[in-house]
């Protein structure tokens, strides 16, 4: 819709002026002329229809003297139009059809009296489009976000790198610790590096062999252990260790998986009122075991090994290494305290206390080469001692357990593992052709009879010799242990591993000789659970057996004798 053409009407003095759209009073587009206005006869309107179908109207007042109020009104109405569209431009107000305007010179009358004009130019506020501003803001925001993201990524990358470095450092430290532990274990297990050459000349093989021969003639065991040739000589028969005229090979190149039974150190004999001494036999250890054994190395079930369904207390210790003369029955035991004398093939022994022929001793090898070749000599000594123990295959087994616990079944299993074994039981004394008859008055004779049989078997070299008694207390086994040690036997303590072996109610049902639950409970009260050779050898037979062990009732007397007759019962059907 074209802009509204406003006409100012003069109604006379005191009248209000009205404004109407001029297009209502226009004639048709074909008529070109001047039409009078309502304001007076002197005012004409020139209309012309342009090509763009717009009607341009220009109102000219030919009489400037007439209607000053009208001029004022018309100029006031057109003020905004003149501000926005200047008259000197093509898009400004133009008077079409007027001769003054056709000449190109604006009429002075048209400047103030012009009412309305149209233009092709857009009339509106001048401002910059908001899109550029928004784009700039968005761009700045994206730049900000991208910078923040890049910073964050850099921080995360730095953190990840730092974590990776920390992990690498920890892993390297962990591997270093593992290597150190492995090195320590290898150092404790044996020397894997050749000993540094000392200032002394290297010992040749021929010289060492000559030394060994002279030492064997003198039967000096300590010097044999100091010599490296001892290692070569005892390995001559082994296929993996040829003996030639070369220097002794490094020990790290040789593995010894064929070592036979585990050798354990033991405590020496001590009197009951003195503490057990720390006994370090031969000053060497087996790989992976502590160099100095703990004082409680000999415990009943803690040190036992599971074998054939039972706990086996294996004591392949220094007692098996004693090689006494068969005709010399403990002749060297009559000594006083604080005396030093040669003992055990050249080993210096200092007696600290003596009781019943058994003394507490400390053995010290005088080995000057131990300071220079400590690891090597320890290994040689260990090998030599184990080879010596392996030759001692003779074994004494002492069974322990309450009546009905399964000792007899265990003795049969152990006997079946050896062709030359034999079983002795004090209970056999009361077996006759017409049956079993127990007599408490014959209990002492029964014990002596059983001990004599065991001694004869040991003298003959039978192995294993199995003693099938209850053996609830240590002093009851002392005679058997003494004779076994005197002949170089190993001593082991075995117990049947049955779930009822300490249950008096179940034991009452399972034993064959009618031992009551009350009597079994009394035997269980005095049962010594921890047992070892040192405990047995330091035990003392009670002097008042009648007070400590009251005589049982009829049918139960076979466990109330003076020599530990409760150790007679060993019958059990099965486990």
From Swiss-Prot:
Coiled coil: 162-194
Keyword Coiled coil listed: yes
One example GO MF annotation: enzyme binding
Compositional bias segments (type: Polar residues): 564-575
Disulfide topology: none
One Pfam match: AAA_33
The entry's keywords: Coiled coil
UniProt region (Disordered), positions on chain: 69-169, 555-575
Ranges annotated as biased composition (Basic and acidic residues): 69-87, 129-142, 149-167
Highest taxon of the lineage: Eukaryota
GO BP of this protein: blastocyst development; in utero embryonic development; negative regulation of hematopoietic stem cell differentiation; negative regulation of transcription by RNA polymerase II; positive regulation of hematopoietic stem cell proliferation
Official protein name in the record: NEDD4-binding protein 2-like 2
Species: Mus musculus
Record lineage: Eukaryota, Metazoa, Chordata, Craniata, Vertebrata
